[in-house]
Amino acid sequence: MSYGFLATNNNNEVLVSSDTRNLHFLQKRTTPSSITYTTNFYGGMRHWNYNFTNVSVTPIPFFTTPTTDYYAITKVTNTSGNNWTVEVMRSGTSTSVPEVYLFADPRAGSPTDNYGMIVYKSDGTTSFDSRLKPLTVTGGQAVSHPTNPKSSYSSSGLTAKYCGSIQNYDTSVEYDISNFIPDQYNSYNISGQPSKPIFSYLSLAQAERELTLSESEEECDGVPDGYGGCIGIQRTYYWTSKYFAFYRGGIRWNNGNLRAGWIIAEKGCNWTYYRDTEFLGIGTGSDSGTGGNWPYSNETINTANNTVIISNGAKYD
């Protein structure tokens, strides 16, 4: 640029520039506004919404990690006007909840001090305002997620009949299974951790895995013919159940060690049933049915180059 303001550090990295807008602290929520989903099955999962008001530009959220589970921001929604909702997802069964810090460029802030340093863009709008608690980045990491959320998948213990391993569709009672719990991650060591680490990580990585089971049975209302057939009415039943888990990328923090792994975001199963009836080899009718919910596409996407930004929440408490 031929004019303006530019401040860099010893590594020639940009700290403040009149060409770009710095992030500044706006608001903090210590508890979620609502719990959108919770279960202790499949290793446990929690979905929370944090509501923010009076935010005039698109915000960037950061969160704490009070447990050593996996966390991720899965949605930032402009619900109406200047109102925003941040959805945070976490694995595990703990009752602890993360705090969420909201940052945005200085156009969204309202300074109360009369003194400080302000940097303007060429259009006259503010790019930096020291009175608004600018974001201090203490660390960062580009992370990638393993291609497979789990080292191996087994259908052991699952039934092909009516998805009966996870739900009784007559009583709506749910059951727990461990066949999809993720165990794969990539690990990164981060030096110089702050006193209260907060993280900006938007979950982009997604994966879906399925386990399909099929089973059939024959029933003879008559006399077996000795060759595997039936003299009389014969019914043949076919069942197929497709169990699935949908994963989102998450990060785990433990005293300077950062892991990029997976969180089960959704689970379910779809079943199909078919019955064929014959009398002396002649078809006399059939019956079929289906239930449950269909899985997503069985693929893995966006696993590489996901950015994690680290700051110190203590500066904004």
Question: Which residues does each PLM region occupy?
Answer:
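Broad, structure-driven detector of short, well-ordered beta-strand segments within folded domains
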Residues: 241-256, 261-263
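A cross-kingdom feature marking solvent-exposed beta-strand/loop segments within repeated
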Residues: 67-97, 279
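Ser/Thr- and Asn-enriched, surface-exposed coil loops between beta-strands
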Residues: 77-87, 253, 257-260, 268-270, ...
